[in-house]
A protein has these predicted regions:
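Hydrophobic alpha-helical segments that form the core
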Residues: 103, 108, 153-172, 185-192
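Helix-turn-helix
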Residues: 3, 14, 18-56, 60
Length: 210
């Protein structure tokens, strides 16, 4: 019996991984269907059958990204809030500059370039970023409760500060900043913590590659 006309068999997870990388490298608007199908090794009918459309494919790709590239949650679980915040920043710097993957954070990069008129996409991306911000806020709250920070610390403002630093690190990495430079930014950010806590942390100099 002829096989002509039957949909091409493919591994959905592998195809989704490839799509995630295209979106990560190119962004949402810039990633064409031709680029996506070529990277995924499928044709357009197969893409539509398996994922619906480009927007739904992107939603699945960002969900995969968050499952596989989530360095924030384990970092914030460190024994102290200060150690958790610092690990969150440094671990993400290392991920943003990993030569094996595109630079920066997929969600931050696409959110920054997302046109305001695409309200559904913008809402989805900002919701993901707010989730990270809320995790940071909760960890800072625990730090205040544990006496790491003064009781009158403006937790909301401090959380927004570290969230801004985290997103800025992604943008800087995306535009070519070195790992070494970004770790120095983290050094500065943690001095803000120390100025609030009144207890400067003394650590041995770290050897970091550029």
């Amino acid at each position: 019996m002829s096989q002509r006309g039957r949909p091409r068999a493919f591994d959905r997870d592998t195809a989704l991984q490839a799509a995630m990388r295209v979106f990560w490298e190119r962004g949402y608007e810039q990633a064409s269907l031709s680029e996506l199908t070529a990277a995924m090794g499928i044709n357009r009918p197969s893409l539509y059958a398996a994922f619906g459309d480009k927007a739904q494919l992107f939603r699945e790709a960002t969900a995969l990204y968050q499952r596989t590239m989530n360095f924030t949650t384990p970092a914030l679980a460190r024994p102290t809030a200060r150690a958790g915040i610092e690990a969150m920043l440094r671990d993400n710097v290392d991920a943003y500059c990993d030569p094996a993957t595109p630079r920066g954070c997929l969600v931050v990069s696409v959110a920054a370039a997302c046109p305001d008129e695409d309200s559904e996409m913008k809402t989805m991306l900002t919701s993901k970023l707010r989730t990270v911000g809320e995790s940071v806020r909760q960890r800072l709250k625990q730090g205040v409760e544990a006496g790491e920070l003064p009781a009158d610390t403006d937790i909301g403002a401090l959380a927004a500060y570290f969230e801004t630093v985290l997103q800025g690190l992604s943008i800087q990495a995306r535009t070519g900043a070195s790992r070494q430079r970004l770790h120095r930014v983290v050094d500065c950010a943690m001095r803000v913590w120390d100025s609030l806590s009144g207890e400067p942390q003394k650590r041995p100099a770290r050897q970091r590659s550029a």
